């Protein structure tokens, strides 16, 4: 250690910055000088890893966090990441989360815990005056009204763990005027009284519904359904991010939007829209969403599988109706990406429907699904070649460039064509 001890303080601090927080903490035991340099390390990353078969191991972890944070009392910490699962007492977690007064220079905060409640955000967020990035994997919102407010925050990610087992939050507001990136995964709230997110450029929204709510949404004559009426304020959240340029949504989010079609905001700045699909969920909100994106350039489908209902609207090829494709015809999208293509006839018919209806389309990129647990039609003998020929015909017949992109085990087969 004599060789290291002769190094300047700046060099020692730089060396410690390359170690994990646990390794740096162990090194700080060597001497008071090393301990002082550890307190100046700008990034803390504390991860509860491995098995915790004994209570003393858990207690040791909590004591370790307490000691590390105690060393940082006057430090210039800019990034703090804390990851812990079940077993840590909520009071201990709340104490760790309320670190604003002792970390005044903190710019990035990452919390991954199964037992932090979202009401903690409203309490501790104002204590971080220069915080720019916050990522939280948390337990649940309480039943009362909550407001997330920050003047400095530019990137916010909220993931509620296991929220499918909870009731819908009552009221959530966001007042973050400088936010440019917003990622939100939660049960849809009954109301969003204030959503000031006008600077958001990219948003990833996953508003979740339970199976009963999905079933009610598909039922005929559901306009007066009390359960659905409480979910129709989802448009307020979307209206708050109406200036977004890139929007990624889940199919549940699309179904929430189908409940408030008349209040759907117009996304004048939206250039890229990505929709994640699933076999058990429908496209009820797709038509009105596409009609409200007047400057859309790129449309991405993460899979084309969806649950066909009479409310899928004119965007769906499987429902026979006179106005089929009307929302697509009016959409100015130039580039279409289809991911997770499995080679089914239904998918090919949908692609044909898109090629016919999107009048401004210039390029279509179709990505074959990676080989997974279930066999796709692309792996059926002879089917790959048939699909390749059909897509070539699409490329020749329609006035746009259709590309079929494959990887892994199918790559050699496609290259040989």
Curated annotation (Swiss-Prot):
Q: Which residues form a coiled coil?
A: none
Q: Which Pfam families match?
A: F-box
Q: Which Gene3D superfamilies match?
A: 1.20.1280.50, Ribonuclease Inhibitor
Tell me which domain of life the UniProt entry assigns to the organism this sequence originates from: Eukaryota
Which residue ranges does the record assign to the F-box domain?
1-53
**PANTHER family, from UniProt?**
F-BOX_RNI SUPERFAMILY PROTEIN, RNI-LIKE SUPERFAMILY PROTEIN
Record's protein name: Putative F-box protein At3g58950
Organism the protein comes from: Arabidopsis thaliana (Mouse-ear cress)
